[in-house]
Amino acid sequence: MTTQDVIVNDQNDQKQCSNDVIFRSRLPDIYIPNHLPLHDYIFENISEFAAKPCLINGPTGEVYTYADVHVTSRKLAAGLHNLGVKQHDVVMILLPNSPEVVLTFLAASFIGAITTSANPFFTPAEISKQAKASAAKLIVTQSRYVDKIKNLQNDGVLIVTTDSDAIPENCLRFSELTQSEEPRVDSIPEKISPEDVVALPFSSGTTGLPKGVMLTHKGLVTSVAQQVDGENPNLYFNRDDVILCVLPMFHIYALNSIMLCSLRVGATILIMPKFEITLLLEQIQRCKVTVAMVVPPIVLAIAKSPETEKYDLSSVRMVKSGAAPLGKELEDAISAKFPNAKLGQGYGMTEAGPVLAMSLGFAKEPFPVKSGACGTVVRNAEMKILDPDTGDSLPRNKPGEICIRGNQIMKGYLNDPLATASTIDKDGWLHTGDVGFIDDDDELFIVDRLKELIKYKGFQVAPAELESLLIGHPEINDVAVVAMKEEDAGEVPVAFVVRSKDSNISEDEIKQFVSKQVVFYKRINKVFFTDSIPKAPSGKILRKDLRARLANGLMN
């Protein structure tokens, strides 16, 4: 529903009134126990499913029950504490997807510590920068990555490796820490405040330098509850579900919407360390995956792969995509591959914890939804759309900057009050930098990012719109559209295109394909053919890398 709220701000003893158009979920608000520490909330109902499979290690087939995960994470918490990791200390996870990611995150939470996760394929300099910025005291990793971080030992950073074989010199063995006396963990932490930070992901840096995002116990409890709690949860997971986790767990989407949401409801998580299309399809068939949480590059690979015809994918009842909008053509293609699945999207950003909106088609009692929509605002939260030029809130069907307010958003950026103040205003609204609108049925549609909009002679051109058209062409495997400087127009849209296998589609053919479907100022000016589109682990296109190619004359 939408309400016209009169908001009164007291500034210098002068009251000022303004009408804000605020959007809320079509689902009713629910009670959220966000006074609890995250681990207590996650395991609140564990007695009901302690013997049930919790984690399946895809490569090995090893299964951990909920009781195994609970006990082992508590023992690991005691082991970390014995090494000197205290409340508010930071533990870095430098691992591919594995059960140890789950165990380490929960163990840190138990002792009031904070986890920051980094991509193990980062360069040594990138890892070092994050470790130092977060003041990491201990790093959990695999032996093959130790060379990247061993210089940090000079600063007193401890390194724990998860390998079962021989470990590098001066490193500790993960398995030894999990054999510590488990009951001692109860007396370890001081009282954990709901406002204490529990996770410190670093934002993708697609519009600036990476910054530590402080997510609290209260924030993550709220975010998980907004998704999976209540009589009619927005994201209906159940204890019989097998949830696919192929998205990187060092990204907040997998950490929250897959790992934490699954643990809360007692579902089984199938953990896969990397995406490989044939292996993915084999595991879906073998483990009878019911929920596939994906991002557009994976959707694209599945939709365009002939391998899918060889496997039984009928167990999948839900396919949820996030990180970037899907076009209708891609939605239709993936629906054909998963005939029994509901397909929908969610919308989030790290700073929002991360979920702002989610398809109500995923609810236990689903609502009708439209193709291309990114869902409706989550319950127990508020959303508004602002005019980027005037700052006024906008009514339905008017595109503007998306803003969100609620207990789930970040506490702020680590050691960066200026960046925090420019993102969260004095009234608690988080400004996303994304452009979208809410229609007559409360559904959110993303237009693009403010800074990614192309300005052609004053006209705004949204890259996502053109990408959606282009990806529907059968001879195009992947695409990204960015702005290129042009003296007359200011900026013109250009496309980086990955041809489909055996395709020889030309630049002129692509231009004509688009020109027939858009107004004159949205026409593609140039096409550059490339082997791949650079993307962040979250699936978002790294447009700044493509703009750098243009600036350096390295288009092809």
Curated annotation (Swiss-Prot):
Pathway: Phytoalexin biosynthesis; 3,4',5-trihydroxystilbene biosynthesis; 3,4',5-trihydroxystilbene from trans-4-coumarate: step 1/2. Produces CoA thioesters of a variety of hydroxy- and methoxy-substituted cinnamic acids, which are used to synthesize several phenylpropanoid-derived compounds, including anthocyanins, flavonoids, isoflavonoids, coumarins, lignin, suberin and wall-bound phenolics. Follows a two-step reaction mechanism, wherein the carboxylate substrate first undergoes adenylation by ATP, followed by a thioesterification in the presence of CoA to yield the final CoA thioesters. InterPro entries: AMP-bd_C (IPR025110), AMP-bd_C_sf (IPR045851), AMP-binding_CS (IPR020845), AMP-dep_synth/lig_dom (IPR000873), ANL_N_sf (IPR042099). This is 4-coumarate--CoA ligase 2. Changing C403A: Significantly reduces the substrate specificity. It comes from the Eukaryota. PANTHER family: 4-COUMARATE--COA LIGASE 2, LONG-CHAIN-FATTY-ACID--COA LIGASE. It comes from Arabidopsis thaliana.
